[in-house]
From Swiss-Prot:
Any one GO cellular component localisation term in the record: cytoplasm
Protein name: Xylose isomerase
Cell compartments where the protein resides: Cytoplasm
Residues annotated as catalytic: 99, 102
Family: Belongs to the xylose isomerase family.
Primary location: cytoplasm
Cofactor binding annotation: Binds 2 magnesium ions per subunit.
Organism expressing this protein natively: Dinoroseobacter shibae (strain DSM 16493 / NCIMB 14021 / DFL 12)
Listed EC numbers: 5.3.1.5
Length: 434
């Protein structure tokens, strides 16, 4: 057990009037929301990288955090795990997520790095068994090391492709051994800086082949979790191939993988792509590929991925509304891909930030459930398209021809007039539930 969070009590639900930073006002794990316990609807997870591996640096300055587990040995990695599971206990979160590089030290060779990962997987397995905590998803860091500066799957060097594939295998093995519910692929540097030295077609084929290899290996080892792709439009490269949900679905369809792979959608990445979070979730729901979410927020003025903790209940409510419309999470969940500001140095800051974020999500979920159960918003949406239920409209949609439409307009003197969309009234309706 770690003493890093000494003096911080286990966080429990105390109700809306609670004033402590270490009490839940809205998140009550056992409260029933649309037929499920709130814990089972939200499926909260802590991100290992931001909470325990990030050192507080930025492009203009070095680390600001001084954590006792910062170091390059297995002892440091085990100390980090001890602190992590103590935090999971305090917050009573059921899940966590990691990249391989977050949980193990880098070795002098691939074999040594793999051995370090295997040692830490054994240690995390012991921690899981003792605590009851579970792995929501694992993934491979294929972007930090200099070998990946031109990408991993899309690298012009086949040796880098092979090294990345081998690394993914070790991470899938780790995720499988720990009972992970999903395996995530984020194309950290799968993109380009300039078209002057880029073969777009070749790199797309390479990315498709890598993903097919991942799917094949999933079935070979009997991994029953979901393979998830995470879209992001830019940063760190100028243009990322996995730009947004629509782009990734096109990619999956091209390689026949749309029934094998779903999406892990991040709020901050949606904003970078010029979309709202709910837009990306709704589109993934329509495509049948909504898998899991990374919950955070961006600074709307800065223009880059700030990974702040969520604090906007109306935004979060609209996101969970789309998730509930999809039937809720299956293997996915709500991972806090969120980090402290570099001036927030204290252990208590890390706990308080997650407590507040969990409350925001719980409040948003309850508002979303009220909207969906009430049914008025869906009824108004349905009414807007009522004309399409007419037999003539259905026939037009299911096999109509341009010449038939032309004849109909000419014969009837058709002159359709616009109907109000009522957006302001719909926004007022949504506000009633918040």
């Amino acid at each position: 057990m770690s003493d890093f969070f000494a003096g911080i009590p286990a966080v429990t639900y105390e109700g809306p009037e609670a004033r402590s930073d270490f009490a839940f006002r809205h998140y009550n794990p056992d409260e029933m929301v649309m037929g499920k316990r709130m814990e089972d609807q939200l499926r909260f997870a802590v991100a290992w990288w931001h909470s325990f591996a990030w050192e507080g640096g930025d492009p203009f300055g070095g680390p600001t955090f001084q954590r006792p587990w910062f170091g390059d040995t297995l002892d440091h990695a085990r100390a980090k795990a001890d602190a992590a599971f103590e935090m999971f206990r305090i917050l009573n979160v059921p899940f966590y997520c990691f990249h391989d590089a977050d949980i193990r030290p880098e070795g002098a060779s691939f074999a040594e790095t793999t051995a370090n990962l295997e040692a830490m997987v054994d240690y995390l397995g012991q921690k899981q068994e003792a605590s009851g905590k579970r792995l929501l998803w694992g993934t491979a860091n294929l972007f930090s090391h200099r070998r990946y500066m031109a990408g991993a799957a899309t690298n012009p060097d086949p040796d880098v492709f092979a090294y990345a594939a081998a690394t993914i295998k070790t991470c899938m093995d780790a995720t499988h051994k720990l009972g992970g519910a999903n395996y995530v692929l984020w194309g950290g540097r799968e993109g380009y800086e300039t078209l002057l030295n880029t073969d777009l077609g070749r790199e797309r084929e390479q990315a498709g082949r890598m993903l097919q290899m991942v799917v094949d290996y999933k079935h070979k080892i009997g991994f029953e979790g979901t393979i998830l792709l995470e879209p992001k439009p830019q940063e760190p490269t100028k243009h990322q191939y996995d730009y947004d949900v629509a782009t990734v679905f096109s990619f999956l369809s091209e390689f026949g993988l749309q029934d094998e792979v779903k999406m892990n959608i991040e709020q901050g990445h949606a904003i970078l792509a010029g979309h709202s979070f709910e837009h990306e979730l709704a589109l993934a729901r329509e495509f049948g590929i909504l898998g899991s979410i990374d919950m955070n927020r961006n600074d709307y003025q800065s223009g880059w991925d700030t990974d702040q903790f969520p604090n906007n209940i109306p935004e979060v409510a609209l996101a969970y509304y789309e998730i509930l419309r999809a039937g809720g999470f299956d293997t996915g969940g709500t991972n806090f891909d969120s980090k402290l500001r570099r001036q927030s140095l204290d252990p208590a800051d890390l706990i308080a930030a997650h407590v507040a974020a969990m409350d925001v999500c719980a409040a948003g979920l309850k508002a979303a459930a009220r909207m969906l159960e009430d049914g008025e918003l869906e009824q108004r949406r349905e009414d807007r398209y009522a004309g399409w239920r007419a037999p003539s409209a259905e026939a037009m949609l299911n096999g109509g021809k341009l010449e038939d439409c032309f004849a109909h307009v000419m014969e009837t003197g058709l002159d359709p007039q616009p109907v109000s969309g009522g957006q302001e009234r719909l926004e007022a309706l949504v506000a009633r539930y918040l």
